[in-house]
Amino acid sequence: MVRKNTSYLMENSEEALRLELKTDPEAVRGQAVWCGVQPGMHVLDAGCGPGKVTSILWDMLQPRGRILGVDYSEERIQYAKKHYGNRSGIDFRFHDLRHPLDAMGPFDLIWVRFVLEYNRIESFEIIRNLDAVLKPGGSLCLLDLDHNCLSHFPLPAHMERILFELMKLLETRFNFDAYAGRKLYSYLYDLGYDDVALHLLPHHLFYGEVKTEDVFNWVKKVEVVSLKAKELFEDYPGGRGGFFEDFKSFFLSPRRFTYTPLILCKGMKPSLP
């Protein structure tokens, strides 16, 4: 039986900072153009985190565009309101996407980026909830990673084994989905969406020296996640601390090659008959 923990896997005191630093505005804008974000639209940023991406999308929606960011972290909604909520046409609201979005919308476009990977069991339920507040003829845009955090070379075999065991444990204990990206097409297909299209991009592509913000992001991820599965490191030389130091050494080596694919999937909600 799956043991489900409904808390956010990456919750920590620096999560808003991590999410801010890892967001590449140029990459977000390129993805949004592919998704069809245009001025004047009414958009929902589903799972907005600290609001940086919502703010980038707001810029692209002007003039006369509006965007609502929702998230199930009250702390990050307050952060978003403080840092990005002082402009007309942008708003933030606390809401758990696993529940219906009553009295919201309807929206021209719904943006769902890096959300479903943290909600493995409820992913399709979330999609159905979003579909209910999307206008007929509106666009649903799903963006998520696949084979998340698992593609590295030359990672020693004993470290690679720990990483795969860790991801399996996070799946069963914390509802995390390292393979969320490959499932996006099936969601829109099953809902009968029109004009479904997909695109594949490298989200992480690391070789040689790595930018400081990427080092912070990956080291923080390994630090937070490894604390949730200490038993996996009992037989590792030096325990969890030993693994953490070995991974940092590997990741900081300019010989390391690491990549993670990002899958983008968009479709149009069928118009009313």
Across the structure, where does each feature detected by a protein language model lie?
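A short acidic, Gly/Pro-enriched loop at the edge of an enzyme's catalytic core
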Residues: D102-I110
